[in-house]
A protein has these predicted regions:
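Short, surface-exposed amphipathic charged segments that create phosphate/polyanion-binding patches used
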Residues: 41-49, 111-116, 184-187
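GT-A fold catalytic core of metal-dependent nucleotide-sugar glycosyltransferases
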Residues: 57-106, 130
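N-terminal G-site helix/loop of the GST-like fold
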Residues: 12-26, 69
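Active-site-proximal specificity loops/subdomain of glycosyltransferases
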Residues: 29-61
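Short, intrinsically disordered, charge-balanced linker/junction segments flanking boundaries
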Residues: 1-8, 20-22, 215
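Conserved catalytic core of nucleotide-sugar-dependent glycosyltransferases
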Residues: 92-153
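A glycosyltransferase accessory/donor-loop signature
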Residues: 21-24, 29-37, 128-222
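Conserved small/polar residues in nucleotide/adenosyl-binding loops
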Residues: 6-14, 220-226
Length: 227
């Protein structure tokens, strides 16, 4: 619906603002399926289980970066509290990618505005990924593999084309799962991830950290559409 598209636009722009407001020397490029399809980079059928349009397209990041340098992928429901350059400072060339290795087992049967919650090992590891785009092992993760209908979401989201030693760790503060990690027991967040749903959904209007998100929306003069 136009309302859901409007909500999507708001939280994507808000997430981008939280990145660029604290980091002036970065480029942010949304993964838009229409653009990727136009460029013959993405041609998979719609994923019925996918809760976002980048369920599969996130794995095109190494190719989109011409298999060179480091790039960050993050879900669009994150609120960055700190300069993302401090995250890039953690990169280590021995790894093909780096992520928060959550021990996360959600209980909810649905998420995000009614989408089914799919349970699998390494849940949410792929929601914030530092990609070493030039790593030899990431040459396997190209448009042909990503678009192959036999390539499952579980294969990709578990990083199954990599050996375990090729996956580096970053501190959980950079992918702080709201409602899972707790302050002060687990420290303090550097990037808040509203993984179960955020204040842009009616049934999550007052979720944990809801006011931080609303304050950012107000500051950037974004308007929540009526539902």
């Amino acid at each position: 619906s136009s309302s859901s598209r409007g909500l999507g636009d708001v939280y994507k722009r808000q997430s981008k603002f939280s990145l660029t407001n604290k980091s002036t020397d970065i480029e942010v490029h949304p993964l838009k399926l229409t653009e990727l399809r136009d460029k013959q980079l993405y041609w998979r059928d719609e994923d019925k289980l996918g809760s976002t349009e980048f369920t599969f397209s996130r794995f095109l990041v190494p190719e989109l970066n011409n298999f060179k340098g480091w790039a960050l992928f993050c879900d669009c429901d994150l609120l960055f509290m700190e300069d993302v350059n401090n995250l890039f400072a953690l990169t280590d060339d021995q790894y093909a990618l780096m992520c928060v290795k959550h021990d996360y087992n959600p209980k909810e049967g649905t998420k995000m505005d009614g989408k089914q919650q799919t349970i699998y090992p390494r849940k949410n590891w792929s929601s914030v990924v530092l990609w070493n785009c030039g790593h030899e092992s990431n040459k396997k993760i190209n448009r042909e593999l990503v678009n192959n209908p036999d390539t499952t979401g579980k294969y990709l989201h578990r990083f199954s084309w990599l050996e375990d030693h090729e996956i580096g760790s970053i501190p959980h503060h950079w992918n702080w799962l709201a409602g899972w990690y707790e302050e002060p027991k687990d420290g303090t967040p550097k990037a808040i991830h509203y993984t179960e749903g955020g204040p842009w959904f009616e049934n999550y209007r007052f979720c944990e950290y809801h006011q931080l998100w609303k304050d950012t929306v107000s500051y950037t003069h974004l308007t929540l559409p009526t539902t």
